Swiss-Prot record:
Localisation: Cytoplasm; Nucleus
Region feature (Disordered): 1-27
Full protein name: Deleted in azoospermia protein 3
Listed Polar residues bias regions: 1-10
Lineage: Eukaryota, Metazoa, Chordata, Craniata, Vertebrata
Classification via InterPro entries: DAZ_dom, DAZ_RRM_vert, Nucleotide-bd_a/b_plait_sf, RBD_domain_sf, RRM_dom
Organism expressing this protein natively: Homo sapiens (Human)
Length: 486
């Protein structure tokens, strides 16, 4: 029997390496599959989407010269969460497997690389029945190297802490699409629409973990669309409009749990629309305009409980409109312009109590307008344009102290415009086109206290002042000479 099966040194080394790696793997809770241990190669599990092959190779460079790093992906190119690291020289695989390696704040699962053995049927021993069946014939968990050698990953015992990032598409023919920008860690952001014929689309930006943001519209023919931005966990933000024929649309941004944000307009014929952004629980934000013929609309952003945000203008013919964003209780936000013919409008965003936000332009014929965003007390934000015929407008958003943002165009026909976003102190961002009839506009972002942002006329200083005194003296001297001759 000994002559039939001689034991070579290589087989002894292979058996010892297998025994050592098996003990190291057992210490980490693995059940190694049948096969031959590949020397100088380590299995690496727990790889997430943030890790690439270059970084992993640099991490394992402390143990020896890395020959190749291979991250296993599926047919769509998405990482399966594991891979293999092979070394050029002989390394102590048992030492590497027994070490604790943390990468990007996450502990990696290490083990020996196992090469699948091609066994004949007569040499296969009967094995006990396993609960989990082996992978299908397409070998989703197998890595093939250029030498046509096949490696199996060690079977890791279930761990409730372990997170899996595999993607499972419920409907292969689903029209859902995900367009991503800068990618952060994303888990299970595939969509599982209830109706495969739904025209649901999701456009994502910076991705944070997103769970179950699929829509389940009450009516499959509803033109419901959701445009998502920075995604936080979103639950049940489907729309169930009271009237299936309503043109209701919701565009969501940062998503928080949203409940009952469907609109129930008092008049089904009202052109009421709601555009939602950062969604918090929203209750009763339907519009009940005092006048059914009023063109009142409400566009909501960060939603807090909203009460009584209908507009009751002092003059029914006034073209006043109110656009609300982050909603807190709003009182007295109707506009009472000093001049009933003034085309004054106010569009509010984050709503806090607002006082005295009417515009009192220096020239009653000025078409000045003010649009406010995050509302805190605002004082003296009237515009005093240098030219009374200038169609100057100011639309403010996130406001920090703003100085000198009036426009003094040089060319009246210039279509120059200035659009600002998050406002920090802004100086001299006026446009100086050549014509004073310019349709210049300034749009700013969130509103904080704004003081004295009118542009006062500049007084002469320094050399300019001395030159003015010299000119004045010359004129005065001439006047005196003329009077003396008379």
């Amino acid at each position: 029997m000994s002559a039939a099966n001689p034991e070579t040194p290589n087989s002894t080394i292979s058996r010892e390496a297998s025994t050592q790696s098996s003990s190291a793997a057992a210490s980490q809770g693995w059940v190694l599959p049948e096969g031959k241990i590949v020397p100088n190669t380590v299995f690496v599990g727990g790889i997430d989407a943030r890790m690439d092959e270059t970084e992993i190779g640099s991490c394992f460079g402390r143990y020896g010269s890395v020959k190749e790093v291979k991250i296993i992906t599926n047919r769509t190119g998405v990482s399966k969460g594991y891979g293999f690291v092979s070394f050029v020289n002989d390394v102590d695989v048992q030492k590497i497997v027994g070490s604790q390696i943390h990468f990007h704040g996450k502990k990696l699962k290490l083990g020996p690389a196992i090469r699948k053995q091609k066994l004949c049927a007569r040499h296969v021993q009967p094995r006990p029945l396993v609960v989990n069946p082996p992978p299908p014939p397409q070998f989703q968990n197998v890595w093939r190297n250029p030498n046509t050698e096949t490696y199996l990953q060690p079977q890791i015992t279930p761990n409730p802490v372990t997170q899996h990032v595999q993607a499972y598409s419920a409907y292969p023919h689903s029209p859902g699409q995900v367009i991503t920008g800068c990618q952060l860690l994303v888990y299970n952001y595939q969509e599982y629409p209830t109706y495969p014929d739904s025209a649901f689309q999701v456009t994502t930006g910076y991705q944070l973990p997103v769970y179950n943001y699929q829509p389940f519209p009450a009516y499959p023919r509803s033109p419901f669309q959701v445009t998502a931005g920075y995604q936080l966990p979103v639950y049940n933000y489907q729309a169930f409009p009271a009237y299936p024929n309503s043109p209701f649309q919701v565009a969501t941004g940062y998503q928080f749990p949203v409940y009952n944000y469907q609109p129930f307009p008092a008049y089904p014929s009202s052109p009421f629309q709601v555009t939602a952004g950062y969604q918090l629980p929203v209750y009763n934000y339907q519009a009940f305009p005092a006048y059914p013929n009023s063109p009142f609309q409400v566009a909501t952003g960060y939603q807090f409980p909203v009460y009584n945000y209908q507009a009751f203008p002092a003059y029914p013919n006034s073209p006043v409109q109110v656009t609300t964003g982050y909603q807190l209780p709003v009182y007295n936000y109707q506009a009472f312009p000093a001049y009933p013919n003034s085309p004054f409008q106010v569009a509010t965003g984050y709503q806090f109590p607002v006082y005295n936000y009417q515009a009192f332009p220096a020239y009653p014929n000025s078409p000045v307008q003010v649009t406010t965003g995050y509302q805190l007390p605002v004082y003296n934000y009237q515009a005093f344009p240098a030219y009374p015929n200038s169609p100057f407008q100011v639309a403010t958003g996130y406001q920090f102290p703003v100085y000198n943002y009036q426009a003094f165009p040089a060319y009246p026909n210039s279509p120059v415009q200035v659009t600002t976003g998050y406002q920090l102190p802004v100086y001299n961002y006026q446009a100086f086109p050549a014509y004073p009839n310019s349709a210049v506009q300034v749009t700013t972002g969130y509103q904080f206290h704004v003081y004295n942002y009118q542009m006062p006329p500049q007084c002469p200083v320094g050399e300019q002042r001395r030159n003015l005194w010299t000119e004045a003296y010359k004129w005065w001297y001439l006047v005196c000479l003329i009077q003396r001759r008379d």
